[in-house]
């Protein structure tokens, strides 16, 4: 879903980039970030609010709380990736793919090594897998907006206003939806 939303902006972004209008291009990237951020926020909020009941009803013989926590940690990664995903296209447009490729390879190697170390030498178990991925996805919170701005020759903090707005919106959305959810009766079976 997120990939489809991101891809839908690409033809217009390409057209604007070809025209050389950087200001309009940055504005369009911010719109794309807002859209993909909104989609990832809706998914995350829905899962935070309803996920526990979903797992409890869907998999009654499994440890629903464990599954819920793992799912939330995985989706927290998507909160980061969701908002910066459109910026990956900057590297394709500007033909500056080396740095993002090296960062992706490096974080992949660090991810595997750190998972192995945490699984082998700690009692984290499955949490080690999702937590290392979450922590390393935060790298994209820093490198992607800065390098995208660098490639477009704009101020390095250009995209952070959209990212901060995304995180604030996510926090408010989760709070309001959870508050509303608590007003409904408990869900004990598929019919209620």
Regions found by a protein language model. Name each.
Residues 29-82, 112-116, 171, 178-179:
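Alpha-helical transmembrane segments of multi-pass membrane transport and lipid-handling proteins
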Residues 1, 12-16, 52-63, 181-188:
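Helix-terminus/linker motif at the lipid-water interface of multi-pass membrane proteins
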Residues 1-33, 88-93:
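Helix-loop junctions and terminal segments of transmembrane helices
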Residues 1-7, 39-43, 74-81, 136, ...:
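Transmembrane helix-bundle signature of multi-pass secondary active exporters and lipid flippases
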Residues 31, 44, 53, 78, ...:
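Residue-level recognition of pore/gate-forming positions within transmembrane alpha-helices
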Residues 98, 105-141, 149, 154-157, ...:
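Membrane-interface helix-loop junctions in multi-pass transport and translocation proteins
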Residues 75-106, 148, 152, 156:
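Membrane-interface junctions at transmembrane-helix termini in multi-pass inner-membrane proteins
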Residues 30-38, 69-75, 98, 102-106, ...:
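Internal alpha-helical transmembrane segments of multi-pass membrane proteins, especially GPCRs
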């Amino acid at each position: 879903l997120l990939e489809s939303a991101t891809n839908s902006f690409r033809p217009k972004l390409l057209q604007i980039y070809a025209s050389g209008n950087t200001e309009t291009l940055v504005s369009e990237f911010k719109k794309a970030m807002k859209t993909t951020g909104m989609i990832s926020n809706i998914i995350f909020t829905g899962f935070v609010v309803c996920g526990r009941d979903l797992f409890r009803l869907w998999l009654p013989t499994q440890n629903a709380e464990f599954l819920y926590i793992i799912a939330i940690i995985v989706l927290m990664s998507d909160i980061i990736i969701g908002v910066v995903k459109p910026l990956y296209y900057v590297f394709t447009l500007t033909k500056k793919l080396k740095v993002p490729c090296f960062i992706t390879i490096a974080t992949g190697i660090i991810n595997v090594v750190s998972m192995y170390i945490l699984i082998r030498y700690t009692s984290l178990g499955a949490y080690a897998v999702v937590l290392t991925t979450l922590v390393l996805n935060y790298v994209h919170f820093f490198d992607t907006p800065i390098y995208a701005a660098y490639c477009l020759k704009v101020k390095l903090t250009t995209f952070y206003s959209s990212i901060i707005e995304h995180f604030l919106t996510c926090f408010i959305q989760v709070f309001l939806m959870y508050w509303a959810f608590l007003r409904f009766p408990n869900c004990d079976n598929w019919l209620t």
